[in-house]
Amino acid sequence: MVVGTGTSLALSSLLSLLLFAGMQIYSRQLASTEWLTIQGGLLGSGLFVFSLTAFNNLENLVFGKGFQAKIFPEILLCLLLALFASGLIHRVCVTTCFIFSMVGLYYINKISSTLYQATAPVLTPAKITGKGKKRN
């Protein structure tokens, strides 16, 4: 199911806001045990993915189709936002959020490159079959 850029912007912005609010509401519970701090990092990684999607959709609406997110400032800004939100819960959440976000970013980049990257034909130099210098 494919939605338009504007709809995707609205959905990802709403999900980012709800995820951030949920992380803040349940911050005491998320910081209570080891497994829940890992879950807090996973939620922070989800916040990273949704905020990156919203940010890139906004850029596509403003600058036109085909605009791609770069490491600086888009990815770095969204990563810092997610790490800050995870840091408000627990220090371990920051570490797990960073790890989960990097894994998620790797797979997002891998999927994006297979779908949207244009493959250029490989040019091989032609073999010259003419008279060259004679060797004595």
Swiss-Prot record:
Cellular component GO terms, alphabetical: oligosaccharyltransferase complex
Record PTM Phosphothreonine, positions in chain: T124
Transmembrane feature ranges: 6-23, 35-55, 76-108
Protein keywords: Endoplasmic reticulum, Membrane, Phosphoprotein, Transmembrane, Transmembrane helix
Spans within the Cytoplasmic topological domain: 24-34, 109-136
Pathway(s) annotated for this protein in UniProt: Protein modification; protein glycosylation
Membrane topology qualifier: Multi-pass membrane protein
Location of the motif Prevents secretion from ER: 133-136
GO molecular function: enzyme activator activity; protein-macromolecule adaptor activity
InterPro entries, per database record: KRTCAP2 (IPR018614)
One Pfam family recorded for the sequence: Keratin_assoc
Principal localisation: endoplasmic reticulum
Family per record: Belongs to the KRTCAP2 family.
Its biological purpose: Subunit of STT3A-containing oligosaccharyl transferase (OST-A) complex that catalyzes the initial transfer of a defined glycan (Glc(3)Man(9)GlcNAc(2) in eukaryotes) from the lipid carrier dolichol-pyrophosphate to an asparagine residue within an Asn-X-Ser/Thr consensus motif in nascent polypeptide chains, the first step in protein N-glycosylation. N-glycosylation occurs cotranslationally and the complex associates with the Sec61 complex at the channel-forming translocon complex that mediates protein translocation across the endoplasmic reticulum (ER).
Stated name of the protein: Dolichyl-diphosphooligosaccharide--protein glycosyltransferase subunit KCP2
Organism whose genome encodes this protein: Mus musculus (Mouse)
Lineage of origin: Eukaryota, Metazoa, Chordata, Craniata, Vertebrata
Gene: Krtcap2
